[in-house]
């Protein structure tokens, strides 16, 4: 029998169709010779299927449908949630962290539909209706181009994006011109003065301009890479800590020959007498006797100051944590004691302070054995008071600049941040312990920058440290508090760059003012520093989420500091330029008002948990306003006194009970106001008038008499107490707030009790009201 597959196929003898059941029955012997003979049609079908599935025919096979992805590349890589926001053009996470979002290139239709639904596209069409003249670019069919422009919303949207990108480009070019002017001015100055070589000056200019102006303009669907985003091909990943450094090898030899571990009972007993060991044992006894109190106070500190301390930390401690980390437990406890009302824990604080002081001072000798928790404790000693001002004769005031510098260097020595950088950027491993160490580093960096700038100890920051500070933004666990710290570091770095090249920066600001490029207008008459204004725009979204507005405190504080430094350091130049002096004074005054008004909006609970530096900013703003009180016209003087007195009222016993955290600041501000008012008895101010052109001349004459406190502009708030004691015999003093039920009654009595000489400051306003 012919068994060729091409043989004719005979139908079934019974005439029935070949059903599925029939085929399944014959499938058992499909591969046998017998099945091929009896059912040649099955062999033909099998051959057809084999030919269909052959590699030659795979090209005609329908491709497999690819699963649609709804998350961007960055969020998908870290496996986190991705919420696309059509109005912004990128997902929420990439927008907050300022990263490049791949959805910006794939969601054009969704963005356009959102604009249509919101009605924004109609507004764009009406605004850009006259842009139809662009049709002359297509000379072949102008009418067709015009009609398509009017009907197609996509074209209008593209024109809108083009206008937006052109506006952004113009702003970028304007800032570029400012940079070039600064470089040219600095180059001229360095050429005229042979103090430094031209290479050094150009390097300094690069630091102050290029480092502070880091262009981050966003346009359309393409986004220029932000500073916080890394390019792996441009990274400097070769940095590492030497495993066999010379001094480490010598230290290991010394440790082997003269071991620090005790080997005998006498040595163990002597080791227990070391100051650090004694301090730990003594605090452990205090903790065992007051365990519940320590847990309560530690929780109060962690909850009340959660906005200011390291983000993402614990909210309470337990026995195991306390025994493992005695130093930081003692710091939690003693800081919370200053938050208590009416000196509730004064007796316990007297006992606890010597123990904390010994633990803190002995960290210098325990440098090699410090842990991250110990360094975190030193950080909080920099940020908050651990001693009472009323007991200053027994309890020391520690220098926060020295402590923060020591803690920062200790952390860089103890933790290998080069390994962390390699894990995060190359291996993309996000370890919670690494995140904790980076958060300590960022908090220490922000604290050190604030105190170094405020103390006038200006130094250039390490570039590698800046790279470490940015690593937190790469973690999926990063939160709002981490963004706050990064923005604080960025602001401090900008201001630090300004003060490094202060003379050149002042010359550039003066040149911008003379050329009407100072960024102000006739209504506000405020000088806009381009670097600080850039920071404000760059972190605009983050500032909008900061309900308390605490970030703007430091922003206003640096404005006040820069303006006051201009007045004190370049007074001879400002004497010859009255308009620029008035502009700087007005800028300093408005930012002082902004800082004080922002403070008045804070709830009392947040004020009590605020760190020392926030209180320093508050006092400095009041001190500056009172120091330059007589440089303002009469109406502004009344506003200054009213606002400073409101701050004193806010910090006093009305609405809050007396406590260490707020009462001392209120006393300092009260002393500043009293001192500024008693100065009216000295000098000759009766000849003052409201002529703004003579403002600086009168102020300088008054300063020349040696009576104005502004003659010593570098005076710190700590000196105010001494000046206040010298003037304590004056008849005018701010009345006690306990005598009044409201601020209006208090301030009315305060104003009525002014001396006749003091009331002369406001006579012009009263006469004006009477005439009207």
Curated annotation (Swiss-Prot):
Pfam families with a match to the protein in the record: Zn_clus (PF00172)
The entry's DNA-binding region: 72-101
Start-end of Basic and acidic residues biased regions: 39-51
Record's protein name: Uracil catabolism protein 2
Coiled-coil annotated residue ranges, if any: none
Superkingdom of source: Eukaryota
Keyword NAD: no
InterPro entries for the chain: Carb_Metab_Trans_Reg (IPR050797), Zn2-C6_fun-type_DNA-bd_sf (IPR036864), Zn2Cys6_DnaBD (IPR001138)
Misc note: Present with 937 molecules/cell in log phase SD medium.
Location of the protein in the cell: Cytoplasm; Nucleus
